[in-house]
């Protein structure tokens, strides 16, 4: 049968009934909400026609305000005005104090060590502050659409961990939103440009926002985006451009008073306006704090050039992490308002050797991609156009030594999806590997469903653990699983395709999940025992090879002690006590440490034989 089509109770779309769906870009500096109308994705504005909502909340004894009004209050009531709360999401108080020591807020630790921000409205955690921002966006959407959205897609940075993602979901729940999916920001940007339905290849997402810089390298294959590498600088953004320009204006005006917050605000405001104007003009007149003068684009470029260079160094490092060069990138997508700066576009184009995509407003592109995805997920696309986005009903994995199952893609993962993991060889000189694909939630191969087997041959003759095989699982939108195994040093690869859920009924899937829950404790015990037996076999095989090669390095007494320890380990292996096996492994390790050191010394002497000191 096909993969289960899952929808929340009460959310199964009736024929011809259009559902309200929105995409939200919950940003560090600004946030946006967008929807699809008449087949076109568009951002929703406030009553003053503004798309952007500053991600700022001002708290009072009698309530709070969000957005532009809250941002204006920052000058007068800094301690009760929370901004850039996205940086705090999912972090402990100790982590925040280490990373951001100069924040103006007063923090308290909750019982579980999470941060609480002290405000006039009480102590609030980052999830609650984020919920207030999301509530403001939800109210804007409800007003514009004439009803409560049936579902929302919220974007998050690709590097967000589970705690940060869960915090975002919790904030949405507090705001009364039904989250269809969290979507990686770079993927949303690529979707906005329609790259998900275009040619396959490598895409770079250059995201220079107000407070942070992120670079993401994606590979698009069969409609699936795989994040190859991410990088960036959490302390570099357009705000730093503004700061440099404001400092330059201070120097020109001869103003050095750092205690006047209103004066600070005036210079910063003048810097922001000048930066925006210089995106389309060659020069701009400035009047601030009694100083009048002109700043040119050339002067601005000179100020910010070192910061732009820092972003490109991050790009180079991230490409290196992905094993790629700038020439391997087919498309470059610009995200974030700071990418409007002409120098940024020029330098990025030069670095990648191609013109970046900038036709969609860089402030809006992530929200637009999220809106397109939300429109699909609530079922508004006609069948002929709709990409089936479903979940994997049972975990997918492969067999490892000892009859164990290594899960690669957990159940309930949204498809399409791609995940990869590295494995290595178990024996010296191993020239091939049989890859056994499995489906299920249990820890042992015998308790899971076998999907397929395929072989990878032609591995280089190396010691155990020397060859590195990258196994990639990819499930497309139709539920078709493709698995590729590649040895990294030689490029030797093999692959197979299989329909994971073919032949399974809903009842069988439910039974497999229930069995995994009922047998969880026994399964964990069985896995631990199997893992210790595999490790024992590895230790004994390695020791046997060492004794054959270098027994001459040991006295008879020393060899006798090692052999006795190995025989004891072999005996323990036949039993069913993982603790006893682990203890026997430690004994062998202790008894062979001096032997290992002598073997290392002998190996070094052999390697240096016949060479002078100058050659080493």
Curated annotation (Swiss-Prot):
Keywords (A to Z) from UniProt: ATP-binding, Chaperone, Nucleotide-binding
Keyword Transferase found: no
InterPro entries the UniProt entry points to: ATPase_NBD (IPR043129), Heat_shock_70_CS (IPR018181), HscA_NBD (IPR042039), HSP70_C_sf (IPR029048), HSP70_peptide-bd_sf (IPR029047), Hsp_70_fam (IPR013126), ISC_FeS_clus_asmbl_HscA (IPR010236)
Domain of life, per lineage: Bacteria
Biological process per Gene Ontology, one example term: iron-sulfur cluster assembly
Name of one Pfam family that matches: HSP70
Gene Ontology terms for molecular function: ATP binding; ATP hydrolysis activity; ATP-dependent protein folding chaperone; unfolded protein binding
General function of this protein: Chaperone involved in the maturation of iron-sulfur cluster-containing proteins. Has a low intrinsic ATPase activity which is markedly stimulated by HscB. Involved in the maturation of IscU.
PANTHER family cross-referenced by the UniProt entry: HEAT SHOCK PROTEIN 70KDA (PTHR19375)
Family classification: Belongs to the heat shock protein 70 family.
The protein, known as: Chaperone protein HscA
Source organism (scientific name): Pectobacterium atrosepticum (strain SCRI 1043 / ATCC BAA-672) (Erwinia carotovora subsp. atroseptica)
Source species taxonomy: Bacteria, Pseudomonadati, Pseudomonadota, Gammaproteobacteria, Enterobacterales
